[in-house]
Amino acid sequence: YRNWLAQDDTLSELLELINRQLTEKGLKIEKASAAVVDATIIQTAGSKQRQAIEVDEEGQVSGQTTPSKDSDARWIKKNGLYKLGYKQHTRTDAEGYIEKLHITPANAHECKHLPPLLEGLPKGTTVYADKGYDSAENRQHLEEHQLLDGIMRKACRNRPLSETQTKRNR
C-alpha cells in the first residue's frame, strides 16, 4: 500500500485534505513560522537476518540472501544492524503536524532530498533539520527561496565544530 499511496500524488492529496480539515476545526494553525524536517527508516516485510550481509555503495546486497518481496527496497546499516526498506523524509509544522512526505530507498542520503520537502513554504519560514541535511547546496536553496536556516551543523574531518556552532546545534 505504501507504493500505491506514493504514486500520482495520492499521499500528498491525502495529507492536504487532513491538514485542511484540522485547520477548519481550529486544531491547526494555518501558517506556522517554522518547519521541522527529519527522516526515518520504514522496514519492509522480509525474513530476519540469519547471516552476515555485505552491501555495496548503492545498497545492493553482495552475496546470497533471502530474496525480498519488495524489489525497490534497499539495505542500510543503522546502529550496527542492517535494515531493508525505505527512508521517509517528513516535513512537519512547529506543532508536529505532517505537511509533506518524500519516500526514497533506505540507502539514499538525506542531504539530496531536502528541496522537495520545502515546496510551498512561505518566505521567512525557519527550516529546522538534523545534520543529515547539512550541505552547501541545501543552505543555498534556503537562501534562494528566502527561508531561514535552522539546519544543524556537521563537523568535517580534522575540522571540529566551533563552540558557537556546538551551542547552536543544541
Q: What are the functions of these language-model segments?
A:
Residues 163-165:
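Active-site-proximal loop->helix
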Residues 1-154:
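Polybasic low-complexity intrinsically disordered regions
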Residues 41, 167-170:
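Short amphipathic alpha-helical "interface-anchor" segments enriched in bulky aromatics
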Residues 156-160:
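Short gly/pro/ser/thr-enriched loop/turn and capping motifs at secondary-structure boundaries
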